[in-house]
Amino acid sequence: MTSLAGPGSTRRMALAGASVLLVALGLVVLMVVRPSEASPSGGASASQSAPAEGSVDAGFARDMAIHHQQAVEMSFIVRDRTDDEDVRRLAYDIINTQANQRGMMLGWLEMWGLPKSSAGPPMEWMGHTVEPSDDGSLMPGMATDAELEALEAAKGEQAEVLFLRLMTVHHRAGADMAQAAAGAAGTDAIRNLAAGMVRGQKSEMGLMADMLKARGAKP
């Protein structure tokens, strides 16, 4: 699989990956013991049968886990390249929210006894497939390797504007994916999580539009 991280980010991604793994393992335990507290809806409880490997639920969880991984990576990058408190606060919010959501989705896949990756192409669960391109962009909205390298190299306002533009595109595609899952998933857990993602990412898109405008830039 093409790397999602640019040069110099191996240590950061290792730390982020370890944190997400701990969250995922913890959520598996919580969902077995107290399912109503481990998800937005309690829909991952034993009262609902586990979705099939080729289901919308499993496909969305796998693809969005990858999508979220890059959002977390970009947020770590910009956090270290600006002193602007508003941008850093947004980056922290994205890191915390999307790392936790990613952990939930990986935890559900674990609980359902399903693999966390698929041999097929991304987006099959939406009724169409996307072949990963040579530029490193694995799914709609994801930044290319060159864009990640540019973000790594930028500093100050240049980094802020590039991050806000890349994350706006990332959120727009993520919200489209989540909207599809909210309407087609078979489990309450995925439907409710996806609906929450739509609301959260659309709200952040509005915030990022205002932040770009304040910097004299367009999305």
PLM region spans:
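All-alpha RGS (Regulator of G-protein Signaling) helical domain and cognate RGS-like helical scaffolds
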Residues: 4-219
